[in-house]
Every structure is written in C-alpha cells, then in structure tokens.
C-alpha cells in the first residue's frame, strides 16, 4: 500500500486520534522484519559501544533525519555512536572497486556496526552500485563479524539484494517509508531498546570536512 505521509513533518498535533491510529497501522503493516530476536537478546545494561552508520542521499535538507530522529536516538540507547554518510561529506569508502574491503573501517571506529540505508529508486542502475558497493561492504562486515544489523528505508531493490546476503544470525528490517514514524516502529521491533533512559541529542558525527 503506497504511503502518502509527509516524511518531513513529525508533528502530529493536527491529526485526530483516529487518523493517528490509521497512520501507525499503515506504517506497521508495511514493515518487514527478519531475525529480530538476535537484536533483542543483545539488549543489555552495558552499552554495546558500536557504530550506527547511516547513509542518506543528502543533508541539505534531510527532513527524515533530524537530530532527534528515531534512526539516531533508538540505537543510541543501546550504545551506538551515529555516523552519517552523505554526498557532501568525506567518503566512507577506502576503495569502492575492491570487492573484499571497500569500506574504510579505520575511519568508522571499532565495535559492531548497525547499517541503516536511506535510499530511493534503484541505486543498482546507472553505475550507482560502482560508487556505493553496499553488497561488497556488507560481505566485508560479515567476514569480520562486525555487522550487528541491517536496515533499509525506501528502495525494495536494495533490500532484496542486500538481505539475501545475510546469515540468519543477523537481524534486518525494511520499510518502504523513510519518515520518523517508520523509523520508530521498525527499530522498536528490531532492536527492542530499553525505553527508560533519557535520550540525548548529542553523539552524532558526520563524514564532513
């Protein structure tokens, strides 16, 4: 079912309770979750101390990813430090043409890596896959036992291609929508973070100059 929600507006003050309920129902029904139990079992009092690598098309503007977006704050509850990858920033790639080690992991830091991709259309056309070889990157992370989980927002083509690479031990999820509601519903099911700690808006890094 196509969603016609405004991804740039997370203010629900003009929605009635019935409209709000319908919105969340549509979002929830559109989600696809795989192997979420692994992530839930990983929830623990001690921070995971991992990397939340978020890929977006751009940040000027980026309405679906404000400083308080669920894609940033919910992983933060588990101890993930967010890092943004976007066209105007420094590339996270060491050598995109190297199928064994395309990601520059020395720039990202140590620990498990949660990969969230905000993509639209089919980036496997028009040589986009050469510039952003996420298939090879995921295999690189799997081989190093560093891939904590995969989330794809938007493109079903990317989800289909990347989720097929994952072993059953790695949690993954897909949402056709990219709005904050979709992030919230998806990550709550995938990560099951402890809702009790107060959230901070700090702790966001970017690949920028």
PLM regions: where:
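Preference for extracellular/luminal or secreted protein segments
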Residues: 1-209
């Amino acid at each position: 079912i196509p969603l016609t929600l405004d991804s740039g507006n997370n203010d629900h003050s003009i929605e009635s309770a019935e409209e709000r309920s319908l919105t969340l129902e549509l979002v929830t029904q559109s989600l696809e979750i795989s192997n979420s139990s692994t992530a839930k079992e990983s929830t623990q009092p001690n921070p995971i101390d991992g990397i939340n690598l978020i890929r977006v098309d751009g940040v000027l503007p980026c309405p679906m990813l404000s400083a308080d977006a669920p894609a940033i704050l919910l992983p933060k509850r588990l101890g993930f430090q967010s890092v943004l990858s976007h066209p105007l920033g420094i590339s996270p790639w060491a050598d995109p043409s190297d199928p064994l080690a395309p990601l520059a992991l020395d720039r990202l830091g140590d620990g498990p890596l949660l990969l969230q991709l905000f993509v639209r259309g089919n980036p496997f056309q028009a040589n986009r896959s050469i510039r952003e070889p996420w298939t090879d990157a995921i295999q690189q992370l799997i081989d190093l036992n560093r891939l904590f989980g995969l989330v794809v927002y938007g493109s079903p083509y990317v989800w289909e291609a990347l989720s097929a690479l994952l072993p059953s031990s790695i949690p993954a999820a897909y949402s056709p929508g990219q709005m904050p509601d979709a992030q919230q519903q998806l990550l709550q099911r995938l990560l099951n973070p402890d809702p009790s700690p107060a959230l901070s808006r700090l702790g966001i890094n970017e690949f920028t100059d």
